[in-house]
Amino acid sequence: MHTDEMWQLYFPNGEPIPGVGWDSARDNPEEKDSEIVGVAVVFVFRKTKENGLELLWQKRSAGVSRFPGFYDISAGGHINLGESLIEAAVREAREEIGAVISPEDLSFVTVRGFNKNRFAWIYAVDWTDRVDEFRFDDEEVEEVKWVPFEMTHEFKEKYAKPSLKKDNLTFEALKIWFETHGYL
């Protein structure tokens, strides 16, 4: 995360508050129920003959301030002021893991609320027929790792950052999305 970013704020109905952002260098706006912070989340997945469905995880570098050395979702972060949800998802995938994706590559999975005023718009990207050329900023991401989807629960319990260890709803929604779209 860059400390000079302005995060887009939203009304409780999900509409962006025009021209209103939260300075990310300040404390988080968790005390204001009327302002919601948006997060774009991207799960990169692929199907292989060996392991079936796999999810891509990123390991956070030792030098980051939040959750160093823990594994995290493929990519994700706050939506910048004036940025659309799709633009944020594309940007975060590029910035965090060097994945060059287009808006058409993103498939909407679900929206999840967490904390009292944070909402994550969750997308999936099929990487099945692509070459693994992930280039990432070593200061933020140490490595990326493909993990069989059937091992998700065990993997996140052992290696994921604390907030993901207890987040079963997101992964259940992802599983349902995979099932309804013929990946599982």
Model-based region annotation:
Residues K47, R60-A62, G76, V111, ...:
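Histidine- and/or cysteine-centered catalytic micro-motif in compact active-site loops
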Residues M1-E50:
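Acidic, metal-coordinating catalytic segment for phosphate/diphosphate chemistry
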Residues W22-V39, N51-R91, E95:
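Conserved Nudix-box catalytic region and its N-terminal flanking loop in Nudix hydrolases
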Residues M1, P18, G69-Y71, L81, ...:
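Nudix hydrolase/Nudix homology domain
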